[in-house]
Amino acid sequence: MEKPTIILATSNGVGMGHLARASAIALALKEYANPIIVSMAGGIAEIPEFMGIRCEYIPGRDRMWMSREKWDEYLRDRLLALVDETGARVMSFDGVVPYPGVIAAKVSHPKLALVWVRRGLWQKKPQRFVLGLQSQMMDYIVEPGDFARAYDFGPTAERKDAQLTSSVSLFQKDTALSRDEARNVLGLDLNRPAVLVQLGTGDSDVNEKMTAALSGLLGWKDLQVILTKQPLDKDGKSLAPSGLDIRVVRHFPLARVLRAFDASVCATGYNGVHELLPALVPTVFVSNIRGTDDQEARAQWCHDMGFALRANQADLGDITATVKKLQDADVRARLSKKCAELPDPTGGAEIAKILYELAVQEEPIRPSWLRYNQLRIQEHINRGMRHVAYMGLRRLALVYRFINPHIVVQVTRQEPPIWGSQNTAQELHPLIKGEQRFEHLISGASDAYIKRRKEIAEAAYGEKIEIINTKKA
């Protein structure tokens, strides 16, 4: 029997959680299916080269290369084209809010099953109001297990529409490198302590947390401090206090080398918790309270149960003091020993099996266009009455302009996008981050697929109309 193709789509969320889960599922699928990952997250650049999984990057609407409505159509057409090219019968989506383009692709394709990989521990944000409608558009919903699920009191906690699995993680005991092997790969001294720090930078409050955390490491003899990117603010100023030996390393997946570290300081995202704790790394969690993920609840559970230390993310002094506790060898030993009690994160393999079984089943029932349009209306309402009023005024303006048209005096071609099927991080990163539009193709794309993709790009970008004279002749 030919291996079925399964598409794993992810949003461009905060951090790498969505992409890490998709990668873990894809690795488990490789044995008996052909997984393809599509994502709006820039981190997808790392996957093809290091995991041997075919991928496509899709520019998100945050790039502002087209209107929101046009981007929804663009995403739908991109996904449908990929389904037609690969013969995929199942597509999963890992993200808080399934984009209208994702659901429209499902509604438009008679044989495509749509699975929502819906993480729990939501904060009570406006997204919860469309949860019911979104769920009804799915053929199947999977909830990746969370160590801290007992502290989940968010909008998904009481729902009965999802299949709960074990937690999903790229860290697996059997494939992770030993301490010395990992240190050799990263170029670290075998005989000096090493701490991994994974906190974001950007806005001033986030930068202050980074500085506070690094300050807690001062005085640790012979310490190697490992970051995944330079600790700089937007003006290029260092956020690190003097006196630390800081090294920046890039390695994907980082889960493979976590045994290199004596301790860690990390945000309390799904990815960090379900990689660091199974790797038995003593950790201080400093929550990022933005986004939908309830990181504070997860951090509190880890702290209360004795698996990690929680720093008060709103108190810089507490962050420094809590991180300083990691310098105590007894504290580190206690945390590491406690983490050994956690169950193995086998959810990637469990979800892979669910997706495979759906792929070999009869075709799913398609949700109705009526239900889809209900969801679109509810989405606009949830964005606020001001947005609804704006949409109404915009429609009226379009009607008025149809009756009283401008004189168009200049039509210019948009700059053509860069096309390519690059599959190394070195090639992909600058293209994904660049200002010129980038249209990424899966490796081995057919001529028909390339032709269809160019039609989609033309419809999305097309021509730019410049109006000089707004009066009728």
Could you describe each region identified by the protein language model?
Residues R119, Q123-P126, Q134-T201:
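A nucleotide-sugar donor-handling region in carbohydrate enzymes
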Residues A9-R21, S204-V206, P416-S421:
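A short, glycine/small-residue-rich beta-strand->loop->alpha-helix junction that serves as a flexible
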Residues H251-A297:
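A donor-sugar binding/catalytic signature common to diverse glycosyltransferases
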Residues L80-P98, L441-S443:
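Short N-terminal targeting/anchoring amphipathic segment
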